[in-house]
Amino acid sequence: GFLDIVKGVGLVALGAVSKS
């Protein structure tokens, strides 16, 4: 659902921040 997409994007964003 929509919330699943939001959660997925949030996890990807956190992952990108952690890598940098």
Curated annotation (Swiss-Prot):
Its main location: secreted. It is found in: Secreted. It comes from the Eukaryota. Expressed by the skin glands. One of its GO terms (cellular component) is extracellular region. Keywords: Amphibian defense peptide, Antimicrobial, Secreted. GO terms for biological process: defense response. Has antimicrobial activity. Belongs to the frog skin active peptide (FSAP) family. Cruzioseptin subfamily. This is Cruzioseptin-15. It comes from Cruziohyla calcarifer. The lineage of its organism: Eukaryota, Metazoa, Chordata, Craniata, Vertebrata.
